[in-house]
From Swiss-Prot:
PROSITE patterns registered for this protein in UniProt: PCI
SUPFAM superfamilies membership: ARM repeat, Winged helix' DNA-binding domain
Membership in a protein family: Belongs to the eIF-3 subunit K family.
Domain PCI, residue spans: 46-208
Record's subunit section: Component of the eukaryotic translation initiation factor 3 (eIF-3) complex. The eIF-3 complex interacts with pix.
Name under which the protein is recorded: Eukaryotic translation initiation factor 3 subunit K
Function text: Component of the eukaryotic translation initiation factor 3 (eIF-3) complex, which is involved in protein synthesis of a specialized repertoire of mRNAs and, together with other initiation factors, stimulates binding of mRNA and methionyl-tRNAi to the 40S ribosome. The eIF-3 complex specifically targets and initiates translation of a subset of mRNAs involved in cell proliferation.
Main location as per UniProt: cytoplasm
Compartments (UniProt record): Cytoplasm
Keyword Isomerase among UniProt keywords: no
GO biological process: formation of cytoplasmic translation initiation complex; regulation of translational initiation
Keywords: Cytoplasm, Initiation factor, Protein biosynthesis
Protein source organism: Drosophila persimilis (Fruit fly)
InterPro entries in the record: ARM-type_fold, CSN8_PSD8_EIF3K, eIF3k, PCI_dom, Transl_init_fac_sub12_N_euk, WH-like_DNA-bd_sf, WH_DNA-bd_sf
Amino acid sequence: MSHLVKMENGQSQTIQEMLGCIERYNPDHLKTLEAYIQDQAKNNTYDLEANLAVLKLYQFNPHMLNFEITYTILLKSLTNLPHTDFVMAKCLLLPQQMKDENIQTIIDLADILERADFTLFWQRAEVNRTMFRHISGFHDSIRKFVSHVVSITFQTIKKDLLKELLGGIEDSTLESWIKRNGWKHQGQDLIVVAMQDDKIKTKNITEKIEFENVGALMAQCL
């Protein structure tokens, strides 16, 4: 869905055009931006700049604060881990937002993900599943981040552990993630995440040092 912002002169701009000018700080555009965020959640799209602009507008206009939109912005930022989007969004929160119980829950979930305690994350996510059920692709976005961490941490991993880290998924779902990440089976119980040769590669480094660079040092040694 295309969102157009109507200017005072009667002309319309796209959200991206509006964000590139002073109009991004106009509270008259807040409702359009909030609708855009709801579409991101529904259609599994993401626009960090627009989302941060909404939080900034809340800072300037706290009487227009919408907690539901704030939840969606924070949860969508989690779907873009390992990028630091959540940290940037959190830094724009108002004191009344920080005191909100649901926002504290989301912050706790973010901390758990940052610690890579994925088993605990999925447990907490199940308890709070109504919080992000409106966000299309949320679980798979988190699994993508889990896969990233697994890929840089393990060479081989037990199949049952991998299923647990990915949220207690079924074998058929696991197969799709193995294929997506280029992993391979080793026997019945192990998954090869990365071959040793792929992890360790020699690199020859040649540095050219001019005589003038060391001349003064050599003179001191004489």
